[in-house]
Amino acid sequence: MTDFGITGYGAYVPRLRIDRALIAEAHKWMAPGLKGQAKGSRAFTSWDEDAITMAVEAARDALTGADVNGLKAIYLASTTLPYADLQNSAIVAGAILAPTNISSSDVGNSQRAGTSGLLQALKAGEPSLFIASDAPVGKPASAQEVAYGAGAAAFTLGAENVIAKLVGMASVTDTFVDHFRATGEKYEYFWEERWVRDEGYAKLAPAAIKAALANANLGIESISHFVMPSLLRGAADAVAKVVKFTGAIAPGLENGVGYAGAAQAAL
């Protein structure tokens, strides 16, 4: 694993933007509280875009100057893949002219697919392409309609010209439900934000961070950058405070992109 890691990266964000103030204005008669969240704009997909097309664009960006024929596997993580019983990653593989003997895998069913899928690819230890692409849809007049965006990010993985490698990891699995979307449903059900923040992020995230640091044999003072995707503004800052992190916190991309679901961490 010491000689294997990320060798290249790419991204794609749809060109279209919607001003959040317009969303709040349209729903003010039934959800006046949205006005306080109506800052900036967010990305959204055009009529001919979806998780697959965005994945292809991000993959092509990541593969600039690279040999696609050297890939052994392709992974596609998303919660909004267009096909339920047809391998979406295989379509991406065809679009980027990958060799036909490549292994392809779809990773989904959770907005954590972006990180869990990347860990799977890193553990496999073979030349591969990992893509996270998502365009979650919020229920009309909900906070999610205001916050959700769209985008994709891709990483090439290999053992040559490594620019970032995995030095430690940890996972915490708990049946904590902050939101869910049942099979066949278009929109999600969300629990109250204070519950998610205080009982979820504030307790589970620090436990995972401390375990990852221990696995890497590092102290928090050795870390210079902290990336934590969250639909709740300020969640990353709150968790950083709990674990006594004083370095740079990656911006949440709220303005211009929005929260891109499974692709958020990679973006």
Pin down the residues of each PLM region.
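Short coil/turn connectors at secondary-structure junctions
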Residues: 1-3, 69-72, 99-102, 124-128, ...
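Condensing-enzyme catalytic core mediating Claisen C-C bond formation in acyl metabolism
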Residues: 1-48, 142-199, 203, 210
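Hydrophobic pocket-lining "lid/loop/helix" segments that shape and contact the acyl-thioester
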Residues: 3, 56, 60-63, 158-260, ...
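Buried hydrophobic positions in well-ordered alpha/beta secondary-structure cores of metabolic enzymes
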Residues: 6-8, 62, 74-75, 92, ...
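Structural signature of outer-membrane beta-barrel domains
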Residues: 11-13, 81, 233
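Conserved catalytic cysteine-centered active-site region
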Residues: 32-36, 41-49, 79-129, 133, ...
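Active-site-flanking structural segment that lines cofactor/substrate pockets
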Residues: 39, 46-64
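Short glycine-rich or small-residue beta-strand-to-loop segments that form or flank ligand, phosphate
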Residues: 72-80, 226-227
